[in-house]
Amino acid sequence: MMYEKTAEHFEQKYKNLPEGHLLVNLGPSHPATHGILQNVIQIDGERIVEAESVIGYVHRCFEKLGERYTYNQFLVCTDRMNYVSTPLNNIGWILAVEKMMQVEVPDRVTYVRMIISELSRIMDHIICLGILGVDLGAFSGMLHLFHHRENIYQIIEKLTGARLTTTFCRIGGLERDIYPEFEKEVKLVCKGLKPAIEEFNSLLLKNKIFLGRTEGIGGISAENAIAYGFSGPNLRAAGVDWDVRKDKPYMLYDKVDFDVPIGEDGSVLHRSLVRMEEMRQSIRIIEQLVDGIPSGAWHADLPHAYLPEKNKVYNNMEELIYHFKIIMHGVKVPPGEHYMATEAANGELGFYIISEGEKSPWRVHVRRPCFWYYQSFAELVRGGLLADSVATMSSLNVIAGELDC
């Protein structure tokens, strides 16, 4: 899979197709791709003989931009990776920077970050499962969960001021403290989600037509999933028990009780089952945290890295100087390198940072889970039906913004 795959490449490779074979484009602008993705597929009747995936349509040079932006400015780039669950990207980046700076944040910050992380995970899974149903002709199922997704969006919008590009968190804390009704609204969302998930489960995962279109389709073995670099729900659906929250715990994930759902054959059905159960487990995590959010500060005492409150800037010379230094000179991260992995909705999201002690990183690399899934698409669909390739793509949940970065 390369950026250099041009029309000439495909013309040369497929100029002598066997009789009866046809070359078709699935994308880059097609309802089934859910983003700017292109798959060039060779078919014999309805059977897929070969497939090639093309990336780069949404490439925005984020890693290179990371060398020019300050550590806080790079948050706007993380917003535009997996834009379905933006706060998970923001938190992953901030945790990587805080590790390099050896910053300890108040427990209140960690609790809020974890609650928002799990709400974002639920939002992402709702999109994946709902759109999978739409692609297979079950439009009504999506509507049962999208109402609750909207309720989560409203919480995030109240907290951050935005729905998609949240730029949630800052180095050392949150952008702002939670609003007074935050805990109450989170509880109401969780209460409403529980029966909605079970209803959705009955509508789709107990439907004979849905089962016929997903069971045994687009499967991958545990060995091949590991070889391709799978992580997250797609890896666990193949039978591999690996979750960064459990195996390399961060924040307070080692203090909460939750189960890691595991599938068997890595098929579309098992990827759906894993995501369905993960939503239940996310609710379980949230309910353990929401009643115990500690009082106190919502950011660490970091005058050299965290912007002071506006009223202090206007009335205190020292605070004004800190404000000027952070804005004009940026946050200086000690020299060194660090890789921080978090469990995003699609899998292991990692940020590798090399610092030379300046306001901007010397090098940034993003380990985005979608990149590895997309490489496997040809193997997953080869020999299957063209219609099944749509279900396979949906179940992988490839987000173009994260794929190309």
From Swiss-Prot:
<dbReference type="GO" id="GO:0051287">
    <property type="term" value="F:NAD binding"/>
</dbReference>
<comment type="subunit">
    <text>NDH-1 is composed of 14 different subunits. Subunits NuoB, C, D, E, F, and G constitute the peripheral sector of the complex.</text>
</comment>
<dbReference type="InterPro" id="IPR029014">
    <property type="entry name" value="NiFe-Hase_large"/>
</dbReference>
<protein>
    <recommendedName>
        <fullName>NADH-quinone oxidoreductase subunit D</fullName>
        <ecNumber>7.1.1.-</ecNumber>
    </recommendedName>
</protein>
<dbReference type="GO" id="GO:0048038">
    <property type="term" value="F:quinone binding"/>
</dbReference>
<dbReference type="InterPro" id="IPR022885">
    <property type="entry name" value="NDH1_su_D/H"/>
</dbReference>
<keyword id="KW-0874">Quinone</keyword>
<keyword id="KW-0997">Cell inner membrane</keyword>
<comment type="function">
    <text>NDH-1 shuttles electrons from NADH, via FMN and iron-sulfur (Fe-S) centers, to quinones in the respiratory chain. The immediate electron acceptor for the enzyme in this species is believed to be ubiquinone. Couples the redox reaction to proton translocation (for every two electrons transferred, four hydrogen ions are translocated across the cytoplasmic membrane), and thus conserves the redox energy in a proton gradient.</text>
</comment>
<dbReference type="GO" id="GO:0005886">
    <property type="term" value="C:plasma membrane"/>
</dbReference>
<keyword id="KW-0472">Membrane</keyword>
<dbReference type="InterPro" id="IPR001135">
    <property type="entry name" value="NADH_Q_OxRdtase_suD"/>
</dbReference>
<keyword id="KW-0813">Transport</keyword>
<comment type="similarity">
    <text>Belongs to the complex I 49 kDa subunit family.</text>
</comment>
<dbReference type="GO" id="GO:0050136">
    <property type="term" value="F:NADH:ubiquinone reductase (non-electrogenic) activity"/>
</dbReference>
<keyword id="KW-1278">Translocase</keyword>
<dbReference type="Pfam" id="PF00346">
    <property type="entry name" value="Complex1_49kDa"/>
</dbReference>
<keyword id="KW-0830">Ubiquinone</keyword>
<keyword id="KW-0520">NAD</keyword>
<keyword id="KW-1003">Cell membrane</keyword>
